[in-house]
Structures are given as structure tokens and as C-alpha cells.
Amino acid sequence: MQVLVNKIWYEGHPLRWLLLPFSVLFALITAIRRSLFRLGLKSQTPLPVPVIVVGNITVGGSGKTPTVIYLIELLRQQGFNPGVISRGYGADMQGVKVVTAADSAASVGDEPAMIVARTGVPMVVGAKRVDTAKALLAQFAVDVIICDDGLQHYALGRDIELVVIDGKRGLGNRHLLPAGPLREGAWRLNQVDFVVVNGGPAQANQYEMQLSPSAVLPVNPKAVAVFDPTQPVVAMAGIGHPARFFETLTQQGFQLALSHGFDDHQAYDKEVLCELAASRPLMMTEKDAVKCRDFAQENWWYLAVDAKLSPQFDQQLLSRVRSVAAAKQGKSHGV
């Protein structure tokens, strides 16, 4: 199914024309929804600290999670104490939940499990972003909130909007769902504060981001094996665009005996992965690793990557955060 969807959205498959009437309906529904917020018929909840929403206007992975991790580290380096909220897509939960390093991806979602495992940041997940933000502020002394995804969740007040675009696939055929991958039209890029292009050339007023491989690490934290870079690996990825990961491995000099893409957010079965790997090392993404760590074998590995952005981006982002923080502190003191 995903193969057909990708052909429709990114390869010009003619079936897209049959889906266009549904895209028109989707456009109408989303336009009405935005109008309700703009006219004040639906309310947006402001928060007492700066809120950065990291999202995209397309369906599927674009590099939001590495961007969130980058922002966490950048803000911490400048003395801020950020916290993160997320939907926790696919999580088996009700209400809101504080994410801990002991939580499984099944209980809190793939991305939250990965973010907390990497950074230890205060994080709360839940279906309603406003409720998760309030819970985060109630339980942790955070002074900046980063919302992982949620660009279209207009009930959450936000001060900075950052959109991540896949530099390889772009906006696909530029049609709205379901004929294309767009959640909102390309016009939305002109309204956000920052547009970050992951792995591709940035246009004027956009910022280029590269994902730089940093280390090969064991999926099983108790494993004592040492990775042999001369040995061919079986590569797997359950992300929005698996081919990007396989291309990265090849560029880094890995020999791929086999590559296999899974659906994004897919749960994994130990037996299936053992059969896939056979006797060879299994190489996966960091997001996949958090779903496999409880049953990982000695020769299962993941490639950690770090987002790299320009000093100009850092300067502009931090300047905006400080400005918003000062304004909100002034309001709280009646200035």
C-alpha cells in the first residue's frame, strides 16, 4: 500500500487525478477549521513560556525528531530549560503521560521514546497538545516548550513555527491529501517563522540542515560485541522515507547485503527481524532501535545521527526565543 501511495504522491501516478475531488473536500474542511480559529469561534490557548512548534506540511517523516533534539541541545547550551510535548503517535495510552527512559515505544510513541532516551528532556505526551503543555508546566520547571509535530493543532498557542521539509522529496506533487502528501498548501510556508530543508538546497529565507552520522551503537544496551565495519550488514528502516537511510549507509561506506523498508511507526516482531538478519549484523535507525531494545540481539546496531544547522539559524532562533520570553515575563509582571 505504501509503495502505491509513494507513486501517487511523488512519482506522478495517474491515480492522483481520481483522488483530486477528495483533496478539494479536504481543502474545504481545513479552511473552515482555520477560519473558526481566526474568527475566534474556536479558541487558541496561550501559554506563559515561549512555545516552538516543530512540524511539517507533508505526511510522513521529514526530519522533525532530529530537529527537536537539536533545539533541545541548543537551548540548553544557552541556559534555557526546555521541555517537549508530543501526540505520542501510536501509543497505547489515555489522557497525558510523562515520558521516562524506562517507557517503551509502544506505551509513549516512537519519537518520544527516542527523544527522551537521547536527551533525558522533560516530556509529556497526549492527544490534546494544550493538556500536555499544561501538564508539562505543572510538573517541571521548564521555560521553553517545544511541540514535536502539531503545526496543524491550532488550539495550542504558539510563538514560533518551524517547518521541516524533506530536501530529497520536497512537497511531492504539491496536492493536498489524499491526492498528494500535503496537510496544508505550500502557501503555509510563507506564514511560518523558519523553514528548514533537510538534506537539500535551501531557497531564500530557508535554512539547510544536514543529518550527520555520529556513531554506530548496539541496540541492546547490555551488548558487549564490537561492530566490524568491514562486514556486510542487513539494513532496515521503519521511517517515512527508508531509502534516505539506506543511501546514508552507502555514503558512509557500509556494504549492504540487503535493505528492507518497513512502514513508519510499525511494531516489530523479534522472529521476523531475526529471520531478516539471518547471521549478518542488522543495522537500523535510532528510531527503530527504541522499539527493538527489549529483544535486540548482540549483532543488532543503529546509526545515530546529529542535525547540523548554520550559526545564522542558531542566532535567529535564539534571538526570537529571548524576545518572546522577555515579552511574556513583562506581561506576567504587569509591565
Curated annotation (Swiss-Prot):
Keywords: ATP-binding, Kinase, Lipid A biosynthesis, Lipid biosynthesis, Lipid metabolism, Nucleotide-binding, Transferase. ATP binds at T58, V59, G60, G61, S62, G63, K64, T65. GO terms for cellular component: plasma membrane. Its EC number is 2.7.1.130. Pfam families: LpxK. It is an enzyme of class 2 (transferase). It comes from the Bacteria. GO terms for molecular function: ATP binding; tetraacyldisaccharide 4'-kinase activity. Pathway: Glycolipid biosynthesis; lipid IV(A) biosynthesis; lipid IV(A) from (3R)-3-hydroxytetradecanoyl-[acyl-carrier-protein] and UDP-N-acetyl-alpha-D-glucosamine: step 6/6. SUPFAM superfamilies: P-loop containing nucleoside triphosphate hydrolases. GO terms for biological process: lipid A biosynthetic process; lipopolysaccharide core region biosynthetic process. It catalyses: a lipid A disaccharide + ATP = a lipid IVA + ADP + H(+). Belongs to the LpxK family. PANTHER family: TETRAACYLDISACCHARIDE 4'-KINASE, TETRAACYLDISACCHARIDE 4'-KINASE, MITOCHONDRIAL-RELATED. Transfers the gamma-phosphate of ATP to the 4'-position of a tetraacyldisaccharide 1-phosphate intermediate (termed DS-1-P) to form tetraacyldisaccharide 1,4'-bis-phosphate (lipid IVA). This is Tetraacyldisaccharide 4'-kinase. It comes from Shewanella sp. (strain MR-4). The lineage of its organism: Bacteria, Pseudomonadati, Pseudomonadota, Gammaproteobacteria, Alteromonadales.
